[in-house]
Amino acid sequence: MTRLLDIPYGKKGESVKVPSHHILDDEEESNAPLIAGGVRRKKVAAMLNVDVYVIGLYFLPKACKKHEGEEDALDAVANDSSIAKTVRLTFVRDVSGESVAKAIAVNIEKKLGSRAGSGGNEESEKKAKEALEMFKSMFRSVKIEKGASLTFSTNESGTLTTRLRGKKIGESIKDERLCGALFESWCGPDSVIPEMTEAASSILSQALKLIPSEDNNGVGSAAA
């Protein structure tokens, strides 16, 4: 059963209600739990930070069992195109879609750039750049009002679908590198919300320890 959880932001005791579960874009339309939540704060002046959005991260821990024991399991999950994932951003101020796309694209470009020439090829790099341009173009002339939710969801084949207020915007984009770089923005070592990433990493590690391995008497776990 999905409940609404309060995530506080700002200095006036305000909060945003975030669903305890979210339907993924996988074939089973799995009802994934909230792994962790947090607040994106952006520095706009030397002594001034503003809250931009509240985020919720959703996926099925049982789908991540293969990454147990890795140095950074959460980052591995972010870059695993076979694991369906969703992030839900609820904005606490009015913003333009272009400004959101630009900010996220900067992080994606950093991730893609850091991998250039390492295990990739010119064709895949070109494809990823084209996918990024498609991503940015979706937000042209889009206005995101306070209280609006923006979700980024990937399925098991590395296809990204974006929804604003529950309605799909633009075309779905199939590019594993883009999807990985996007989710690394919140799940990687250079996360824009490090407190949430640390919490999510800890929660995932604990959850993986409780999930039996698939080869445990040949029986897998149904734990979520």
Q: Over which residues does each language-model region extend?
A:
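Terminal leader/tail segments of proteins
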Residues: 1-164, 168-224
